[in-house]
C-alpha cells in the first residue's frame, strides 16, 4: 500500500510526495490550538508538501465550529478536522489521524505548544540526514523560558524509575546513574541520542511506525510516548534530541489537580511496567510497585488536604497571586490590548516596537527578528506574576522564545496577542 500522496508543485510542475503530516489532538482548548496551528502554518516551508490533521476529542467549548470557521477548507486545503463523538484519549485519537495520514513523517504535536519558524524544517532536515532515526524530540521551553526536563528522557527501567521516585534523580541530576531518567548529563545545545521522545513534540518516521506499530491504546493519556519510544528503539532505530525550541504550556489540556489525573497518570506507569517488565522477579518488582502506589497515595492525600484547606477559607501566599501585564508590540496591538486591559482592570505596561502591520493570515509583511527585543527589559517582582505579552503579528515566535531563553526568571511568563484571534493568551488564561 502506498503511504505517500503525490502532489503537484505549482512552481515547477513536478510531482512531490507528501513530506509531513502534523497531528494535533484537541480537547477544550480552542484558542491554544488555534495559536498552535498558526505557528505551524508559519513554520511550514512553502515547498514542503504537508498536511495538518486536528482530532477533536469531543470538546465542549465549540472547538470544531470555531476552527472550521477560522480555517475554511477553501483557504486551508491542507488542514482537516476530525470530530470525535466521545473522548477517545490521546493514543486512540492520534492513531485515527495516523491511519489517515499520508506523510513520510508524522509529527505528534500538543495543542498547547508554539513552534518556532524554522523548527519543522530543521527537524525534517535532521531526520533526512539520519536515516537511523525513528523519532525526534526538541527543546521544550516552559512559559518562564526554562528548558523542560522532559525534553530528553531515559527509559524508566525499574531501577531508573526507582531512583526517580526516591528523589535521587533530583539530587544528582547530572549523574549517568541516578540522573538517567532526565539524562541531565547531556548538553542542551547539541543534538544527542536519547531514549524517550515526549509526545508533546514527537516527529516519527512513518516507516518506523509501520514496523513497530501505532500508539498503544491501553494508555489513555500518559505513558504512550514512553512505550512507543521503547518500541522504536527495539525496532532497530535511534531516538534523537535536536536543540531547536518550542513553547509548551504544559497541561492546558489537563487539569492536573484532579483525582482523575492522578489515577490516569499512575495507572499508565503500572501499564508500562506490566507490559515491559512483567517477567521480572518479585524481589525487584515489588519495591517498584510499592513506590508507584505510594507516590499516587501521597499525591491524592496532598490534593485532598489542599481542597479541605481552601474549603475552610485558609489561604497561603501564592494561592491568589496578583498579576501585571507588559504588552510588547506595534501601536495597533498596544491599542487593542489596552482595551482588553481596561475591560478586565489589568495592571498593564506598554512597550512600542516599530513594525508594519501584518499581512495575510500566517504571514507578516515585516517580521521582527530576535534583535528587535535586545533592549527589552522587564523587571521581575517576587510577589507578582508578570505576563510579557508579545505581538504575534509583528514578532516572530523564534524571537519571543529566544528572549525568554535569554531571560528566564521565576514569575515572568510568556503570552501572545494576535489580531485574528483578538485574545490575550497566557498560561492558563485567555482574555478578550
Can you describe what each PLM-predicted range is?
Residues 81-101, 122:
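Glycine-rich, basic loop-to-helix element that forms the pyrophosphate-binding segment
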Residues 230-308:
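Active-site-adjacent helix/loop segment of glycosyltransferases
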Residues 187-190, 195-245, 403-404:
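A short, conserved alpha-helix in the catalytic core of glycosyltransferases
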Residues 29-44:
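Short, well-formed alpha-helical segments that are part of the catalytic scaffolds
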Residues 155-194:
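Short, flexible, basic/aromatic active-site loop/helix in glycosyltransferases
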Residues 106:
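Short aromatic/hydrophobic "clamp" motif used to bind/position activated sugar donors
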Residues 39, 56-65, 86:
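A conserved acidic beta->alpha catalytic loop
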Residues 114-150:
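Conserved donor NDP-sugar-binding/catalytic core segment of glycosyltransferases
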Amino acid at each position: 500500500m502506498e503511504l505517500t500522496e503525490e502532489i503537484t508543485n505549482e512552481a515547477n510542475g513536478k510531482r512531490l510526495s507528501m513530506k509531513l503530516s502534523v497531528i494535533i489532538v484537541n480537547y477544550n482548548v480552542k484558542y491554544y490550538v488555534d495559536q498552535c496551528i498558526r505557528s505551524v502554518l508559519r513554520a511550514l516551508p512553502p515547498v514542503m508538501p504537508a498536511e495538518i490533521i486536528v482530532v477533536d476529542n469531543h470538546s465542549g467549548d465549540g472547538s470544531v465550529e470555531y476552527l472550521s470557521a477560522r480555517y475554511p477548507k477553501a483557504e486551508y486545503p491542507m488542514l482537516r478536522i476530525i470530530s470525535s463523538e466521545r473522548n477517545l484519549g490521546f493514543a486512540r485519537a492520534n492513531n485515527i489521524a495516523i491511519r489517515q495520514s499520508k506523510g513520510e513523517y508524522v509529527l505528534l504535536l500538543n495543542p498547547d505548544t508554539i513552534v518556532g519558524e524554522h523548527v519543522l524544517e530543521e527537524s525534517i532536515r535532521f531526520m533526512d540526514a539520519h536515516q537511523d532515526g525513528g523519532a525526534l524530540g526538541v527543546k521544550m521551553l516552559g512559559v518562564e523560558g526554562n528548558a523542560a526536563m522532559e525534553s530528553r528522557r531515559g527509559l524508566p527501567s525499574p531501577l531508573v524509575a526507582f531512583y526517580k521516585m526516591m528523589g535521587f534523580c533530583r539530587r544528582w541530576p547530572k549523574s549517568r546513574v541516578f540522573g538517567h531518567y532526565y539524562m541531565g548529563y547531556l548538553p542542551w545545545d547539541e543534538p544527542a541520542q536519547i531514549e524517550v521522545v515526549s509526545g508533546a513534540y514527537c516527529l516519527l518516521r512513518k516507516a518506523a511506525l509501520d514496523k513497530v506499530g501505532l500508539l498503544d491504546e491501553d494508555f489513555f493519556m500518559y505513558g504512550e510516548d514512553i512505550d512507543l519510544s521503547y518500541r522504536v528503539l527495539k525496532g532497530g532505530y535511534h531516538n534523537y534530541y535536536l536543540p531547536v525550541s518550542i513553547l509548551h504550556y504544559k497541561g492546558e489540556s489537563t487539569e492536573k489537580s484532579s483525582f482523575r489525573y492522578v489515577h490516569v497518570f499512575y495507572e499508565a506507569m503500572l501499564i508500562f511496567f506490566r507490559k515491559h517488565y512483567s517477567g521480572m522477579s518479585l524481589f525487584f518488582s515489588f519495591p517498584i510497585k510499592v513506590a508507584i502506589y505510594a507516590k499516587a497515595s501521597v499525591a491524592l492525600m496532598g490534593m485532598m488536604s489542599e481542597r479541605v484547606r481552601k474549603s475552610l477559607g485558609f489561604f497561603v501566599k501564592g494561592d491568589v497571586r496578583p498579576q501585571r501585564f507588559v504588552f510588547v508590540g506595534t501601536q495597533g496591538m498596544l491599542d487593542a490590548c489596552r482595551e482588553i486591559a481596561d475591560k478586565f482592570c489589568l495592571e498593564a505596561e506598554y512597550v512600542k516596537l516599530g513594525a508594519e502591520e501584518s499581512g495575510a493570515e500566517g504571514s507578516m509583511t515585516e517580521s521582527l527578528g530576535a534583535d528587535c527585543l535586545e533592549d527589552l527589559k522587564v523587571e521581575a517582582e517576587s510577589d507578582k506574576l508578570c505576563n510579557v505579552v508579545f505581538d504575534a503579528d509583528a514578532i516572530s515566535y523564534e524571537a519571543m522564545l529566544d528572549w525568554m531563553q535569554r531571560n528566564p526568571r521565576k514569575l515572568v511568563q510568556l503570552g501572545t496577542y494576535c489580531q485574528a484571534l483578538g485574545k490575550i493568551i497566557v498560561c492558563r488564561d485567555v482574555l478578550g
